[in-house]
């Protein structure tokens, strides 16, 4: 049974990372239009600042949705495999695991626990990728705001 856990867990990690990479690619293209507007227009500092705040807020919300979809993939696997019976329990357990919180009060049976550990590992990877993406967006946005501030002063 342990090899089944590893096979499912690693497959789900690969799937959720593919989902994440796809989602981030779409987000990057969406954010590109914000960047072009910031670079191409002579916006005032206040308007540029509002655009960056709006873009970062939208990015945070869309990343939360993306992480929720990935948790739902794990939850569906738990239900399909019979590791958890209730879809509600499965999604609660999955969100809790993928966030590496581990305090939902739900437990997998002993022979499924490796999957829960692998989901937590997956969550660390996914949240790390998201953090790096947010950092990259800020690395691009911040210099644009600073240069705009210096032009306006």
Residue ranges: model-predicted function:
Residues 1-12:
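Feature marks short, highly hydrophobic, charge-poor N-terminal signal-anchor/signal peptide-like helices
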Residues 1-3, 45-53, 105-110:
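Helix-boundary and loop/linker segments of multi-pass membrane transporters
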Residues 10-20, 89-147:
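Pore domain of cation channels
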Residues 16-24, 28, 66, 70, ...:
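Alpha-helical transmembrane segments of multipass membrane proteins
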Residues 22-44:
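Membrane-interface helix-loop junction between the first two transmembrane segments
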Residues 37-51, 96-101:
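Perimembrane loop-to-helix junctions flanking transmembrane segments
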Residues 47-67:
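Interfacial helix-start motif at the membrane-water boundary
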Residues 64-93:
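Outer-pore turret/helix-boundary of cation channels
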């Amino acid at each position: 049974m342990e090899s089944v856990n590893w096979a499912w867990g690693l497959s789900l990690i690969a799937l959720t990372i593919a989902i994440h990479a796809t989602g981030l690619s779409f987000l990057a293209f969406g954010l590109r239009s914000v960047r072009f507007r910031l670079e191409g227009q002579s916006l005032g500092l206040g308007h540029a600042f509002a655009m960056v705040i709006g873009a970062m807020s939208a990015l945070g919300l869309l990343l939360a949705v993306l992480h929720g979809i990935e948790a739902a993939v794990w939850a569906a696997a738990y239900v399909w495999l019979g590791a958890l019976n209730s879809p509600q329990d499965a999604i609660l357990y999955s969100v809790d695991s993928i966030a590496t919180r581990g305090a939902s009060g739900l437990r997998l049976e002993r022979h499924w626990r490796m999957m829960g550990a692998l989901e937590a590992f997956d969550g660390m990877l996914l949240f790390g990728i998201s953090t790096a993406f947010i950092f990259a967006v800020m690395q691009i946005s911040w210099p644009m705001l600073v240069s705009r501030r210096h032009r306006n002063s």
